[in-house]
Amino acid sequence: MYGKIEKIHFVGIGGIGMSGIAEVLLNLGYKVSGSDLKQSDTTDRLASLGGDIRFGHARENLADVDVVVTSTAVHDDNPEVMEAKRRMIPVIPRAEMLAELMRMKYGIAIAGTHGKTTTTSMVATALTHGGIDPTIVIGGKLNTLGTNAKLGQGQFLVAEADESDGSFLKLSPTIAVVTNIDADHLDFYTGGIEQIKDTFVDFINKIPFYGLAVLCLEDRNIAEILPRVKKRFVTYGLSSQADIRATHIRLEGGTTSFVAHYKGYRMGEVSFAMPGAHNVLNALACIAVAMELDVPFAQIQEGFAKFGGVGRRFQVKGEVNGITVVDDYGHHPAEIRATLAAGKSGWPDRRLVVAFQPHRFSRTKELFAEFVTCFYDADVLVLTDIYSAGEAPIEGVTAERLAENIRKHGQRDVTYIADREALPDHLLQIVRPGDIVLTLGAGNIWQTGEALLRKLETAEG
């Protein structure tokens, strides 16, 4: 960035996407301030790194700053945004600041409706073990780092590319990964899946002539846009037509392994501690990126062997009296199906008890029919009220109605508990040794699993 930019203020700094950028900027020597509605481990970490963190949004939070960065959850009526505009301080979206960081390095951007965080984390781990030492900005906490960001000394920056509002088009990566393309964020993409596909084509074609696109051939929508891709690309998947493919897949407990091939050549076995066939595809994308950067396959294997997973991605929170509590961020029907399938394939003999909190009224409305039929791998399903994420309620769109329709479509054991805070006591009454309890959703449902663990420990003691 131009040398006169020294002080940067983040509105909503505690968000997972904002905090990573703020941490990298702090490590680069910029003065960073920010505000958020509440204190968290994330805000505490940023404060310990030298960030000036305020709680609540107020015009007084905007001290002597050169630029204001906002998340997608922050609107024009925010008092800090209004004050910045009054003082003619530039107000930019998070993606634009990420684009500035990416201009300092060769960017590797991981895009797609699902799997971005896990794939980004895998790429970051593989490149680190390959000696590349990338700068990392992830939408989840990488367990081996204990954070979602790191300033590396190498030439590359690995980051998620958020398609939710089209702002990933501000990025200009050298390597672009697209894991899949699905219908989501339909409040923004009013043209539906065709508009979403068009936007991804634009994103892919932004890479330079010497860059590379890494594209999942298993995804129907990606396969459909391949003729429109104008830049060099490789494909990955399970099909023999994919450039990089997996065979001999094994899913055992929390471990996944497979044999990786490149254009017919057998490279070797990869194993990592994260369940689910969908994570095989994420791992193949990682291998494609690492191979493009000439990381030896042995070091790629080592990176996977030491991959510690990602916070809120099938994260085992604890086990008490034979009851395992797992948390996952999945909130789209496709993600839910994949996550439940991972649980069933890894532990076929264990009962899967799912506590689901729908995320956003708009998503629940647009994808209602898909939500109704995506829970069949759950032996027991409990729904709680929709996490609004700042949205106004939509008439007729409720978790209770969703639960009723899930039951009508053949799900046998479905319960609706309106108050999320009542869930731990309800779960305590129904769980038994051998169960896997999965809290599922992008809101605050993770607190339910932690509360249940405390109650189980008390009951055991």
Curated annotation (Swiss-Prot):
Q: Which organism is it from?
A: Geobacter metallireducens (strain ATCC 53774 / DSM 7210 / GS-15)
Q: Name one GO cellular component term.
A: cytoplasm
* NCBIfam families the UniProt entry points to: murC
| EC number(s) on file | 6.3.2.8
As one GO molecular function, the record gives:
UDP-N-acetylmuramate-L-alanine ligase activity
Q: Which GO terms describe its biological process?
A: cell division; cell wall organization; peptidoglycan biosynthetic process; regulation of cell shape
Question: Per its UniProt entry, what is the enzyme's top EC class, as one word?
Answer: ligase
Kindly state which keywords UniProt assigns to this record, in alphabetical order.
Answer: ATP-binding, Cell cycle, Cell division, Cell shape, Cell wall biogenesis/degradation, Cytoplasm, Ligase, Nucleotide-binding, Peptidoglycan synthesis
Annotated residues that bind ATP are located at G112, T113, H114, G115, K116, T117, T118
Q: Which domain of life is it from?
A: Bacteria
Listed name of the protein: UDP-N-acetylmuramate--L-alanine ligase
Gene3D superfamilies the record matches: Mur ligase, C-terminal domain, Mur-like, catalytic domain, NAD(P)-binding Rossmann-like Domain
Q: Which reaction does it catalyse?
A: UDP-N-acetyl-alpha-D-muramate + L-alanine + ATP = UDP-N-acetyl-alpha-D-muramoyl-L-alanine + ADP + phosphate + H(+)
Indicate yes or no for the key word Cell cycle.
Answer: yes
Q: Which Pfam families match?
A: Mur_ligase, Mur_ligase_C, Mur_ligase_M
- Purpose: Cell wall formation.
The pathway where this protein functions is: Cell wall biogenesis; peptidoglycan biosynthesis
Intracellular or extracellular location(s): Cytoplasm
Tell me the protein family, please. Answer: Belongs to the MurCDEF family.
Does RNA-binding appear among the keywords?
Answer: no
